[in-house]
UniProtKB/Swiss-Prot annotation:
<feature type="disulfide bond" description="Or C-89 with C-137">
    <location>
        <begin position="90"/>
        <end position="137"/>
    </location>
</feature>
<feature type="signal peptide">
    <location>
        <begin position="1"/>
        <end position="22"/>
    </location>
</feature>
<feature type="disulfide bond">
    <location>
        <begin position="103"/>
        <end position="145"/>
    </location>
</feature>
<dbReference type="InterPro" id="IPR000617">
    <property type="entry name" value="Napin/2SS/CON"/>
</dbReference>
<feature type="disulfide bond">
    <location>
        <begin position="30"/>
        <end position="101"/>
    </location>
</feature>
<dbReference type="InterPro" id="IPR016140">
    <property type="entry name" value="Bifunc_inhib/LTP/seed_store"/>
</dbReference>
<feature type="disulfide bond" description="Or C-103 with C-152">
    <location>
        <begin position="90"/>
        <end position="137"/>
    </location>
</feature>
<keyword id="KW-0020">Allergen</keyword>
<dbReference type="GO" id="GO:0045735">
    <property type="term" value="F:nutrient reservoir activity"/>
</dbReference>
<keyword id="KW-0256">Endoplasmic reticulum</keyword>
<dbReference type="InterPro" id="IPR036312">
    <property type="entry name" value="Bifun_inhib/LTP/seed_sf"/>
</dbReference>
<feature type="disulfide bond" description="Or C-45 with C-104">
    <location>
        <begin position="42"/>
        <end position="89"/>
    </location>
</feature>
<protein>
    <recommendedName>
        <fullName>Conglutin delta 1</fullName>
    </recommendedName>
</protein>
<keyword id="KW-1015">Disulfide bond</keyword>
<dbReference type="GO" id="GO:0005783">
    <property type="term" value="C:endoplasmic reticulum"/>
</dbReference>
<keyword id="KW-0732">Signal</keyword>
<comment type="similarity">
    <text>Belongs to the 2S seed storage albumins family.</text>
</comment>
Length: 152
């Protein structure tokens, strides 16, 4: 009976070591992938989306105040540029081979972009846009991914 207990303990320890080793290997692989992938297109897309939201809010505020101020925007070229940034962003995120690594990429974008936010509202817009990206890119919501690592 003692031999069986020792054998079970050894097998459990071996499983733990293998699992830990695989996790470390996965983390190292993700770090390498994040160093190789260029997330600039994702950052640009997010910047454009937040700017667009702010412009829409300003337009609504003007309308509520009764100011008839027409803003001429070059929608077609702007939308085309946004679409191109989004397509390239999705390609970059799809290059990452796991949801955990994709989550790390979104967290990395949040960390770099949140420094430029002016207030909590912009941070929330940033979080919201980053949370939408996986669905927009077609690989669904990321499970257990907290975009803002400070809130963990």
């Amino acid at each position: 009976m003692a031999k069986l207990t020792i054998l079970i303990a050894l097998v459990a320890a071996l499983v733990l070591v293998v699992h830990t080793s695989a996790f470390r290997s996965s983390e190292q692989s993700c770090k390498r992938q994040l160093q190789q992938v260029n997330l600039r297109h994702c950052e640009n897309h997010i910047d454009q989306r937040i700017q667009q939201q702010q412009e829409e809010e300003e337009d609504r505020a003007r309308k509520l105040r009764g100011i008839k101020h027409v803003i001429l925007r070059h929608k077609s070229s702007q939308e085309s540029e946004e679409s191109e940034e989004l397509d390239q962003c999705c390609e970059q995120l799809n290059e990452l081979n796991s949801q955990r690594c994709q989550c790390r990429a979104l967290q990395q974008i949040y960390e770099s972009q949140s420094e430029q936010c002016e207030g909590r509202q912009q941070e929330q817009q940033l979080e919201g846009e980053l949370e939408k990206l996986p669905r927009i890119c077609g690989f669904g919501p990321l499970r257990r991914c907290n975009i803002n690592p400070d809130e963990e």
